[in-house]
Amino acid sequence: MSADKFSEIFSGLEEAYGTYEIQKQQVNGKQSGQASVLRSPRTAQTWEGHLSGKGPAIGIIPINADNNCKWGCIDIDQYTGFNHKELLDKIVEMKLPLVVCRSKSGGAHVFLFSKDWISAKILQDTLTSISAALGYAGSEIFPKQIKLQLDRGDVGNFLNLPYYNHEESLRYAFKADGSAATLEEFFGLYEAAVQTVEQI
């Protein structure tokens, strides 16, 4: 099932996850809303509700209790008129194994995926270097933490996931030609880009 595959790709902290309800759009194009952290595991219904749009949009904390991740993201916060195709062309030119998704506000979420769990510090360092190489130094990097203090209630920061209400979603991945990828096409983009721990 699509929800199972999607949840496997976006594995993260099991103990908590985020939800986000959009309330209005600001002048700069960024959408504002109510973010919440739920300190409970996700269920199959949580994932299915995200993809169908019948439940809340969810966000995942990429770093797990062992301080490892299976994905990370460069969050490029440029909203109005952002040129995703230009970014895609640069990624292709540099032969980087990345998947670009449109964020909820029209910016870009640039994902690096790992087949297995990898140290949050290694992934964060790699994405920081890639961000600078792409010309977006200073962009927010997920995972934001390299170590969680779960015993102190620290669950880290979540990233809003793509493909909310996937059949009508504006939070889609981009194909190489700049067109929107369906959820099934996203799975193909993931398979083409996912790296081993050694490659990262």
Model-found features: residue ranges?
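Histidine-centered divalent-metal-coordination microenvironment in nucleic-acid enzymes
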Residues: L98-L123, Q149-P162
